[in-house]
Amino acid sequence: MNRPSYVTDDRLRHFISEAIREDVGDGDHSTMASVPANMIRRAHLIIKDDCILAGVDLALEIFRYYDKDLKIDVLKKDGEFVKKGDIAFEVVGSARSILTMERFVLNCMQRMSGIATYAHDTVKLVEGTITKILDTRKTTPNFRMCEKWAVYIGGAQNHRFGLYDMIMLKDNHNDYAGGITASVTSTVKYLKEKGKDSTECSLDIMDRR
C-alpha cells in the first residue's frame, strides 16, 4: 500500500528518533545486562485478534533505523484483514536490538491496527451511500501522523492534517468573531489578502439535543 503524502522520510525519522530517545534514553539496561551482545535470534509478530493490519511499514522503518542489519520478512501487509494466530512478519538479527525495539513496534501497531479496523468498519456502514468518513485533529499529541496513516489504511479519508493546511470555522470562531456572517466575511478577506482565489465550504449538521 502506498504511503499518504504526509508520511515523509523526514517525518518518519523525526518520529522514530524522538520515540527511541523517550524510551531507550542512554540504553536498554535490562537487555544489555542479561542478553549477550553477539546473540542472534528470530522473532515473529503474532496477531492476537482479527483486525485490519496497520503499522507494518512503520515497523520496518523502526527496525531499520535502530539496526540496519536486522532482516525482516513481511508476511502480511498494511490494509490486509488478518486473523488471530496469523504471523505479520519475522525478524532475524541481534537479540538485543529485537528486544529493545519490541515494545515500540507493538505500541504503534496495536494502536494503528485498532484505528484502521474501526475506520474500515465505519466505512462499511455507509457503503453504497454518498457519505464519506473523514478523520479529525483529535489525535494523540506527536502521534498524529501514525493515527491519520491508520485511518488511511482502514479506507476512510484524511481531513486537514493541522491548523495550517485548511481553514475550518467552528462555533467558537463564530462566537468570538461576532457571528457566522462576520466570521465568514473576515475569512474571505483574509484569503484574498493571502492570494487564495477559491474557498470550499461545507455545512456540518449536528444534533445538539
Where are these regions (language model features)?
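Acidic/glycine-rich phosphate/pyrophosphate-binding loops and surrounding catalytic core
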Residues: 2-209
